[in-house]
Structures are given as C-alpha cells and as structure tokens.
Amino acid sequence: MSHIDLALQELLEITGATRVTLRRDLPGDYAFPVTNEALLPGAPSLKEERTVDLKAQPVVLELLKGRQIVQDDCRTAFDDPRFHRMLEAYGGLAAQIVTPILKTRKLVAIVSLHQLGSPRQWGDEDMAAAAQTSERVAALL
C-alpha cells in the first residue's frame, strides 16, 4: 500500500465514510481521473468511471477557487441536472466533503470523502480530517 493509499484509508476509517478518492490533474482526455481510492466493502469504485465531465460540474468550479465543499445532502446542493446525473453515476452519492489540492494556485488534485445512500451531517472533525489528509497527500505528490 502506497503512502497515499494509506492516507486515504485512514481518512475512511476516521470518518466512517463509504469512499475516499484522490483525483489528479493528469494529461489525457479525461479531466481529473481517480488515481487512488479507499472503499468500504461493497462500495463501487470510481477508478474506471468516465461518464461524468468534471469540468462541467459545479463542485469543481468552486474547487478552482480553493474552497473545501461540504454537502450534507447532495440532492439539495445544486439544481444542475449534470450534477444530479453524477450523483447516480457515483453509486448514489448522498453527502460529500471535497477538498482541493492547489499548487501555485492551480488545482492539481482533489480529495473527496463520500457517503453513499443517505444524507449525512458532517462534523467539524470530518472537515478537519479531510483537510489534513489533503495536506498530507499534497506533500506526497
């Protein structure tokens, strides 16, 4: 297990979430593919998912501003139909914390903490853990 995989696994265990992903800005046709992830047993992987255009997602537009996004109930977060299609494509994504990793003000990676199935009230400790993991991963990139 790589140091990045270990960091994601620890975040999964600390928060009790369903899935943690790392997306990186890599060359190629698909923006920000999932390069690493930690999953609860039975949770669907996003490593091969390529149907969602992340560049058109409202969450990514906020991440470009350097903001951590916290959504307790994703269904109420945005009206954008593309966002709602993403929720289904991602296995019934119900709640998430999405944290940008910026280098020289450029979005280079994204750490996402996902809760599938039902909305979830994220606590301050969940947000802090996601931010700390993002800092840890940034140092490894």
Predicted feature descriptions by range:
Residues 94-102:
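A short, aliphatic-rich beta-strand micro-motif
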Residues 9, 21-61:
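GAF sensory/regulatory domain recognition
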Residues 101-115, 140:
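Sensory-domain boundary capping and coupling elements
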Residues 72-95:
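Signal-transducing coupling segments at domain and membrane junctions
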Residues 1-22, 133:
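Amphipathic alpha-helical coiled-coil segments that mediate homodimerization
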